[in-house]
Amino acid sequence: MGVLGKRGGARSARNNDQHRQLLDATLALLAEGAAYAELTVQLIAERAGVSRPTFYAHFDDRRELLLELMDSALAPAVADLAGQGPTSGTALGPTRIRPTIALAMSIFRDHAPLFRALIEASTYDDTVRDWLGSLAAQFIDAAATTIRAQQAAGNALPLDPKAAATTLVWMTIDAAYRQVRNPPDLSDELVVDTLTTVAIRTVYGDQPNQHASAPAPPNRGRPRRR
C-alpha cells in the first residue's frame, strides 16, 4: 500500500520488537521537537535502546525509516483512494470534496511531527521529494479522473482537469502543512471549510443547486496559542 511499494521484504523475519522500538523512538524524538536533520542514526538507536548495527539491520538509513512511518500514517488516505474508505471513488465529486479534504487535514493533524519532518526532508533530499511527488500524483490522478467524469455529465466547468487537480491537491497539502507547522491562527475545521468552498467553486462554479450537501463555511476560528 506504500507509495514506493513494499521495501525490505527480507526484513520480515527480523526482530519485530526492535523494529518497532526504532520507529517509536523516531516518533518520540520528533514529537519532542527534534528536526529531521538532527535525527542521527546514533541518536535514534540510543533512544530505542539498540546499537547502530541493529539499526542498519532494519533500515538502510534514516530516510527509509521516515518513509516507512509515512506509509503507516497515510494508510487511511491510500485505502480511501483505493475504494476501501468512506469517501472513496469520487474525490472531487460535489458531495465528496469536504470529506476528502477533512480526511487529509485529520491525518496531518494526527501525525503533525511526522509531516513536519517529511516536508523538511523534501527540501533537501531528492528521494523524499520524489516520494512526496508520487504521493501527490496518486491524488491528482484520482481528482483529474473525477473532474473529467463530472465534465462529461455536464456538471463541471470546462477547465483543464490535470491543471485543476494539481492545483487543488497541492493547495490542500500546503494548507494542511501550514496548520501543523506552527500554532494556527485558524481552526482546522475553518480551513477545511474554506478549502472546500475554493475547490467546489473551481470545479463546479456557482451552482448552488448541485451542491446543497456541501456545508457553508462557518465563521469560527481560534486565537493563536500563546
How would you describe each model-predicted region?
Residues 1-39, 43-47, 64, 223:
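Basic, helix-initiating cap at the start of DNA-binding domains
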Residues 23, 98, 102, 137-148, ...:
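An amphipathic alpha-helix signature
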Residues 41, 70-78:
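Short, basic, alpha-helical segments at the C-terminal edge of helix-turn-helix-like DNA-binding modules
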Residues 49-59:
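Short hydrophobic/aromatic patch on the recognition helix
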Residues 59, 65-73, 139:
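Alpha-helical DNA-contacting segments of helix-turn-helix folds
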Residues 68, 82-110, 165-168, 192:
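Hydrophobic alpha-helical connector segments
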Residues 110-141:
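Short secondary-structure transition hinges
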Residues 129, 151-197, 206-217, 226:
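Hydrophobic/aromatic-rich alpha-helical bundle segments in the mid-to-C-terminal region
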